[in-house]
């Protein structure tokens, strides 16, 4: 089904609005994928907050014109699925992870921070841990010195408490022997 001019303008406007909110673009060729596989990919993308859309390349080029993703226009050829995300790595991660399990989805490239990325660049971007994991690791780094200090102080207190307890036991024993002798 072909789109008339108004429909095309609406598609370009919708994609351009998504592009304006996104940090990352991932491109993949979907030739040979079954409908079930595409549905699975779309479901995964939705769960991760990734806008995934099959577009005519001409419309995609118009949507990214004048944006940070314009540099990826050279990679826009063939039957492509476009993944946009506000999260810096989500789109790349969804596409790369799906391509690992399905060889018919072929990575083509993408863009991040105004720079075009090749296949290796998209894979490298996807290998970065998620924001939540990075925050957890950072929190662990912040907590590590504090917990280490607390353990040292507890060990020091225990070390000082043991001789004090032994002295108290000896003093009690001395008092008991004096009372028994006296």
Swiss-Prot record:
Gene Ontology cellular component? ribonucleoprotein complex; ribosome
Q: What CDD domains would the database entry show?
A: Ribosomal_L10
A GO biological-process term: translation
Pfam families, sorted = Ribosomal_L10
Keyword annotations for this protein, in alphabetical order, are:
Ribonucleoprotein, Ribosomal protein, RNA-binding, rRNA-binding
Q: What Gene3D superfamilies does this protein's entry cite?
A: 3.30.70.1730, 6.10.250.290
Q: Which domain of life is it from?
A: Bacteria
Q: Which GO terms describe its molecular function?
A: large ribosomal subunit rRNA binding
Family, per entry: Belongs to the universal ribosomal protein uL10 family.
Main function: Forms part of the ribosomal stalk, playing a central role in the interaction of the ribosome with GTP-bound translation factors.
Tell me, how does this one assemble?
Part of the ribosomal stalk of the 50S ribosomal subunit. The N-terminus interacts with L11 and the large rRNA to form the base of the stalk. The C-terminus forms an elongated spine to which L12 dimers bind in a sequential fashion forming a multimeric L10(L12)X complex.
Name of the protein in question: Large ribosomal subunit protein uL10
């Amino acid at each position: 089904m072909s789109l008339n001019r108004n429909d095309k303008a609406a598609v370009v406007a919708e994609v351009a609005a998504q592009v304006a909110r996104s940090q990352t673009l991932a491109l993949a060729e979907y030739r040979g994928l079954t409908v079930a596989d595409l549905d699975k990919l779309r479901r995964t993308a939705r769960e991760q907050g990734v806008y995934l859309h099959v577009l005519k390349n001409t419309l995609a080029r118009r949507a990214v014109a004048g944006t940070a993703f314009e540099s990826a226009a050279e990679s826009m050829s063939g039957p492509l699925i476009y993944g946009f995300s506000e999260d810096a790595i989500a789109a790349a991660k969804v596409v790369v992870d799906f391509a690992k399990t399905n060889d018919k989805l072929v990575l083509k490239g993408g863009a991040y921070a105004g720079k075009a990325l090749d296949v290796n660049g998209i894979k490298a971007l996807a290998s970065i841990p998620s924001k939540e994991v990075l925050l957890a690791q950072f929190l662990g780094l912040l907590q590590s010195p504090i917990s280490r200090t607390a353990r040292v102080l507890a060990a020091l207190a225990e070390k000082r408490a043991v001789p004090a307890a032994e002295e108290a036991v000896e003093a009690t024993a001395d008092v008991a022997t004096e009372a028994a002798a006296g």
